[in-house]
Amino acid sequence: MAMPRNLPGQAAHDEADQEILRLDGIRKRFPGVLALDGIRLDLRRGEVHAVCGENGAGKSTLMKIISGQYLPDEGAVHYRGAPVRFRSASEAQAAGISIIHQELNLVPHLSVAENLFLAREPRRGPFVDTKRMNAEAARCIARIGLNVAPTTKVGVLSIAQQQMVEIAKALSHDARVLIMDEPTSSLTEAETVQLFRIIEELRADGVAILYISHRLDEMAQIVDRVTVLRDGRHISTDDFADVSIDDIVARMVGRTLDDAYPSRQSVPTDDVLLDVRDLRRDGVFGPVSFALRRGEILGFAGLMGAGRTEIARAIFGADRPDGGTIALHGRPVTIRSPREAIRHGIAYLSEDRKKEGLALPMPVAANLTLANVRGIASRFGFLRFDDEIDVARRYVQDLAIRTPSVHQRVRNLSGGNQQKVVIGKWLYRGSKILFFDEPTRGIDVGAKFAIYGLMDRLAADGVGVVLISSELPELLGMTDRIAVFHEGRMTAILDTKHTSQEEIMHYASGRSHA
């Protein structure tokens, strides 16, 4: 995926080395947490500057201060050579600082043009000047090479196209500083190449980009400098060409990670927990057959559209299959809903943990007990809140969930700790079969290692684990066997010890024999 680029620090203009943004001594406190402790950062025109750190390192808080969503408790922000104190995101945006969040901030039922000019529509008298708005939107989206009509509803666009709409929206505000939060997390390789092309063009126009990503390997293609944060502190800032990925990882976690994956302690038995035969959803997948053994981690590999998530959802009862059988512990079962699947000991950890795995406004304690409320209820049906707190504290300690208290709202936790809460929820339920769907997407290397360790511990305790992942090294590092899918069909089941990325991709592309 390599592409032509400027050398580190080399933008297209003489102004490239001119500082556009500087932060000095930034501190930010929340109840029970010092989120930022004396952070310093500078950003130059025409520069792509990566900010790296584990979840909880302070990246999101720092970006929210720069973009006007938070005020710092201490320290100074200088923008274009003058001290600033933005009191809202709209103030920062008006000054030329825009942020593109990982969860895109668009209105699906509105058109591209309406999203670009929401709350600032051009007017002719008391009426919106739709013709002018569409014309201006067309110019904005043409600048970034987005080939859609400005009247197209945003909801019908792909994630990559929606992200380009967000970039066009920022440019319509004449953004000179653009913050990109995990911009490639939901993109295909081809879409990532397109995004990097746009970033190169923005850099050439003198736009300064703060780039947040856990995908360190892709940074070499576009990043000029990299700043590492840890526990709310500034650790280092370097030209990207002067440091290795191992250096960055070691600074992020405060130690060297000799192995990306833990030494496996689990050994699968011959006891079959889940036996799926000829399962199908017409037009979606199948027929598919496989078995999951006690203590096994079974991988699901495949390209986008291969049907991996759809198969898991059908087994979990979220989608109704059109045929096939499911047996648990040797006994046929009929699963018509997630409630029935949960009762049978099956859990599904969705790839979208925020929408489908957590109740974000609720505290950690309530989320941990959500799947097994009866476990903390009296015989009269009343919740015993002291028991809920005891259960939550046990899992917070056992899973090393970083939170100021079990009363903290789960939306305030980092992505890795949110994922641990989801796992804890199913552990408290006593689930014996767990489907992990992209469990490490959007979390840092240290949190990934912790999640891997939990998965192996579950398998060692006799749980059957299915790992759905788009990361082939993850599948090779964590599984016993790998089932490969292509367009809804299983093309192979491979012994992980005796396969390779090349063989997996061979079958994932639909070929039957390596």
Curated annotation (Swiss-Prot):
It catalyses: D-ribose(out) + ATP + H2O = D-ribose(in) + ADP + phosphate + H(+); D-galactose(out) + ATP + H2O = D-galactose(in) + ADP + phosphate + H(+). Gene3D superfamilies: P-loop containing nucleotide triphosphate hydrolases. Residues 21-256, 267-512 form the ABC transporter domain. Keywords: ATP-binding, Cell inner membrane, Cell membrane, Membrane, Nucleotide-binding, Repeat, Sugar transport, Translocase, Transport. GO terms for cellular component: plasma membrane. ATP binds at G53, E54, N55, G56, A57, G58, K59, S60. It is an enzyme of class 7 (translocase). One of its GO terms (molecular function) is ATP binding. It holds the Pfam family ABC_tran. It is found in: Cell inner membrane. Its main location: membrane. Its EC number is 7.5.2.11, 7.5.2.7. It is a peripheral membrane protein. PANTHER family: CARBOHYDRATE TRANSPORT ATP-BINDING PROTEIN MG119-RELATED (PTHR43790), D-ALLOSE IMPORT ATP-BINDING PROTEIN ALSA-RELATED (PTHR43790:SF3). Belongs to the ABC transporter superfamily. Carbohydrate importer 2 (CUT2) (TC 3.A.1.2) family. Part of an ABC transporter complex involved in carbohydrate import. Could be involved in ribose, galactose and/or methyl galactoside import. Responsible for energy coupling to the transport system. This is Putative ribose/galactose/methyl galactoside import ATP-binding protein 3.
